[in-house]
Amino acid sequence: MQLTRLVQVDCPLGPDVLLLQRMEGREELGRLFAYELHLVSENPNLPLEQLLGKPMSLSLELPGGSRRFFHGIVARCSQVAGHGQFAGYQATLRPWPWLLTRTSDCRIFQNQSVPEIIKQVFRNLGFSDFEDALTRPYREWEYCVQYRETSFDFISRLMEQEGIYYWFRHEQKRHILVLSDAYGAHRSPGGYASVPYYPPTLGHRERDHFFDWQMAREVQPGSLTLNDYDFQRPGARLEVRSNIARPHAAADYPLYDYPGEYVQSQDGEQYARNRIEAIQAQHERVRLRGVVRGIGAGHLFRLSGYPRDDQNREYLVVGAEYRVVQELYETGSGGAGSQFESELDCIDASQSFRLLPQTPVPVVRGPQTAVVVGPKGEEIWTDQYGRVKVHFHWDRHDQSNENSSCWIRVSQAWAGKNWGSMQIPRIGQEVIVSFLEGDPDRPIITGRVYNAEQTVPYELPANATQSGMKSRSSKGGTPANFNEIRMEDKKGAEQLYIHAERNQDNLVENDASLSVGHDRNKSIGHDELARIGNNRTRAVKLNDTLLVGGAKSDSVTGTYLIEAGAQIRLVCGKSVVEFNADGTINISGSAFNLYASGNGNIDTGGRLDLNSGGASEVDAKGKGVQGTIDGQVQAMFPPPAKG
């Protein structure tokens, strides 16, 4: 039934089940094609579900008997009112990348170029009908995020940024996506290297030709300047500029944008070039209408026979529209009356083609939380900038380890040149992540929060008046291993508490002052060493008591002066020496010896009495008993409480 027709249908339901009555199609470089098919069938009960998602193709007869194919996936089908003995159906054919508009994800790609990312997305979704015709190297992205967007939007915006576009090569059983970035990816189809222009009044219809021509030129910006910032080279100048000159009066209007999404100037130069080429690709467009069955988007051809000689040149087809109408099948008239017409949107083949960015870039509207991650067995994982890695709650693909994200900078209270504050978030902690310009590719940690697993250091709300900072020893620290500075603001019980888990070093480069309004209690578990470079003065308003459990030694290179207003009393066991304010000196003991290696003198201004057998007037009562001293010393060092 179709053999004599201009266009034939090949569908999953079998030969001649569906017949083409009319087709409208649109193709465009870097965009998805759509072919709207108006079909008829002798069967009014076709199962539409057996068409959806299945491949279907049309074959268009070309001059000389060869055929051109339009192949796609049935994205939509419907049954409509028929005509006579035929039921009516409609189907929309889309390319296989259209199926990427039906799936979305949140995932992270690291250390890959955009072509590598695109191919990975295709393969992960089970597609292999693509071809790489790219001509230049592409930079490696350290970090690239697909965030709450379809897989198609994700790869589309990346291609728009990198200056990549695509088109489709059709075969009978498949269509192939061709990744392109330059003239070399395109060819002229067989028999169509040159296509003539015939004015419609001449009526030449013996070969494919154009019969209508339009050319338009439009003012576009003449230059684009981009800028960005690299924190690893904060003083680097990253501003780049690209321009394309045009010979008209308004050709030099500049564009400026920030951020340019790069940290290397050569990448910025390429991005600026891509964008100005995309803009300037709109400067001149030629639209040709005719009967040219073999040419579509992505093809090259040379126009001939047009009255304006400068337009007889080589063109790249950047867009194509097709209209096919076939005679009603009820007439039985075969292919008579079938019509084909196309409109081609073209640019000069010497002009670079780029896509204007039109795919929405996802914006993270507000901060998120994430969990700090790192290698197994580590508690802190950071780099030389104090950056950490995190697992985002939306990322279902990572393994929550050191490969989960890029290194992310952490906001600190101060950040000076070799000075400031530093608290590195630790593995397992929950942090607040913001995004520069809302860009999911540019995260920055701005805070930290507690949760049911990472709980607060003080029992709440009972201790709501307490604030401070409490750390944890690492590696292998337990809740008993920490440093802490804590403030208690409860009225009447205010306190500043400082706990050092091991050592505490205080360095004062000038003066230090300590003032205690009431009591001060000082306890040292082992030794104390005090070095005083000049003088020391100590004043005690009332009593001063010193208890020494062992020996005490005082060494003085000069004068050792001891003064007492009432009495100096030295007691050792049963020996007592008293120095009284009235000048009386009393010495008492069970015996005494006076030794001199030289002469000895006793001078007295009054009488000198030497008595034997008399009782001592000075006793050893008081604190001179060793057992009493030992007891008092031990009382100052009670044993630690058990349990």
Swiss-Prot record:
> Cross-referenced InterPro entries, in alphabetical order?
Gp5/Vgr_OB (IPR006531), Gp5_Vgr_C (IPR054030), T6SS_RhsGE_Vgr_subset (IPR017847), T6SS_Vgr_RhsGE (IPR006533), T6SS_VgrG/RHS (IPR050708), Vgr_OB-fold_dom_sf (IPR037026)
Q: Which compartments does it reside in?
A: Secreted
List the GO terms this entry assigns under cellular component, sorted alphabetically. extracellular region; type VI protein secretion system complex
Coiled-coil intervals: none
Matches recorded under Gene3D superfamilies: 2.30.110.50, 4.10.220.110, Baseplate protein-like domains, Gp5 N-terminal domain
This protein's source sits in the domain of life called Bacteria
Q: Name one GO biological process term.
A: protein secretion by the type VI secretion system
Q: Identify the keywords attached in UniProt to this record, alphabetized.
A: Secreted
Give one Pfam hit by family name. Answer: Phage_GPD
Q: What is the reported phenotype of gene knockout?
A: Deletion of vgrG1a shows residual type VI secretion. However, simultaneous deletion of all three vgrG genes (vgrG1a, vgrG1b and vgrG1c) totally abrogates bacterial killing.
The record's annotation in PANTHER family points to:
PROTEIN RHSA-RELATED, PTHR32305
State the oligomer form and interacting partners: Forms homotrimers. Part of the type VI secretion system (T6SS). Interacts with EagT6 and Tse6; these interactions are required for Tse6 loading onto VgrG1. Interacts with Hcp1.
Q: Which family does it belong to?
A: Belongs to the VgrG protein family.
Q: What is the protein's known function?
A: Part of the H1 type VI secretion system (H1-T6SS) specialized secretion system, which delivers several virulence factors in both prokaryotic and eukaryotic cells during infection. Forms the spike at the tip of the elongating tube formed by haemolysin co-regulated protein 1/Hcp1. Allows the delivery of the Tse6 toxin to target cells where it exerts its toxicity.
Q: What is this protein called?
A: Type VI secretion system spike protein VgrG1a
- What organism does the UniProt record list as the source? Pseudomonas aeruginosa (strain ATCC 15692 / DSM 22644 / CIP 104116 / JCM 14847 / LMG 12228 / 1C / PRS 101 / PAO1)
The record's gene field reads vgrG1a
